[in-house]
């Protein structure tokens, strides 16, 4: 039986007592089934030459390493999060490309390949995650690794007009072709990648999803990531802590609109605040009878763009409350702090509307978690951005354009006044999708497809490396 090796920028420590996110749950499920290794950065800066820190529990080994301050800055802060993250979320205006950061990104991917190489066994299958590690398969191939290597991109893949604006776009595309299997959240992301590839070289495609580019064979497929709906339902329905009992009492006479995500410009939070203001302006009958709570803990607080959006939200929240607030009623609660994930599931359950309106998002698991947390007999309504990957699956949500504040306001009004029968019907349809495509189904499909790939031989790889095709005119 093949062993599974998972590679990600960060690893979830084995003693993590907090609620695990989507990646951790899916990865651990796959590792428990096959046994294997989870390899990634420890989250600490220090001496890169120190031996890997290894912890084994059951049939899983966690192997982590430190990064130097310089590599952390170049690889993680600069290229991954100041170039790739904004570009892949369609924000070229925020891209800060610097050649030393690109060199640092490549240097760290090579370093990680060197560290992982002694741990790889002949029949291992390797599953690499996300934008921090786009060149990783290429680095392993250079070191003679012929194992099956798969890659899953958790964030969107931008259209060629966006992606090809990145100075090293051609190198990144060719490096991605060294993976055997490339997984995307949506069909739009998969096609955007192939369109970018076709703009740089000739791509031969057979059976729809088997491709050859730069003489390299690879496959592409769509794997929308899921959640653990049963676990979330249990968390949501459990006993309420005292603070939430008090909150529930406060919300007894108002309808609650609730949103939670980390503070990030891709989430559309300023646009969301303005849409809520449009609701209060266009539908004054709701004034004094609703409350919008936005939880947005700080993320990457050292980055200027994130500091700017935090200040913008604080200003807008104060302005909206000052304009529409009344004695005894505050229309908008903005909380820039972290809340326990299990507590959030309980808050979801007692919310009348879940407002999830990112400007661009690979999937957005919050939308799925909101649905899973609801009481099926009296569910809340999900208002969801058309630019979230989840909108492709949760078609019974109220789908909106987050750039159109009046559209979002109208959807909020509809959600607040929706009859119970319609709420139950829409919720049941979405829950059925979530249950059928849960986190275990996601990882099982990917691992199954990766195992079906024919391993690369050294001879085949050498032949592929010299085979080239002219770019399309």
Swiss-Prot record:
Keywords associated with the record: Glycosyltransferase, Transferase
GO MF annotations, alphabetized: alpha,alpha-trehalose-phosphate synthase (UDP-forming) activity
UniProt cross-references to InterPro entries, sorted A to Z: Glyco_trans_20, Trehalose_OtsA
EC number: 2.4.1.15
SUPFAM superfamilies (UniProt xref): UDP-Glycosyltransferase/glycogen phosphorylase
Annotated residues for binding of D-glucose 6-phosphate: 10, 76, 130, 300
Substrates-to-products reaction catalysed: D-glucose 6-phosphate + UDP-alpha-D-glucose = alpha,alpha-trehalose 6-phosphate + UDP + H(+)
Entry superkingdom: Bacteria
GO biological process terms held by the UniProt record: trehalose biosynthetic process
Binding site for UDP-alpha-D-glucose: 21-22, 262, 267, 339, 365-369
Pathway: Glycan biosynthesis; trehalose biosynthesis
Site (described: Involved in alpha anomer selectivity): 85, 155
Record NCBIfam families: PRK10117.1 (NF007513), trehalose_OtsA (TIGR02400)
Function text: Probably involved in the osmoprotection via the biosynthesis of trehalose. Catalyzes the transfer of glucose from UDP-alpha-D-glucose (UDP-Glc) to D-glucose 6-phosphate (Glc-6-P) to form trehalose-6-phosphate. Acts with retention of the anomeric configuration of the UDP-sugar donor.
Family stated for the protein in its record: Belongs to the glycosyltransferase 20 family.
Assembly with partners or alone: Homotetramer.
Protein name: Trehalose-6-phosphate synthase
Organism of derivation: Salmonella arizonae (strain ATCC BAA-731 / CDC346-86 / RSK2980)
Lineage of the organism: Bacteria, Pseudomonadati, Pseudomonadota, Gammaproteobacteria, Enterobacterales
Gene: otsA
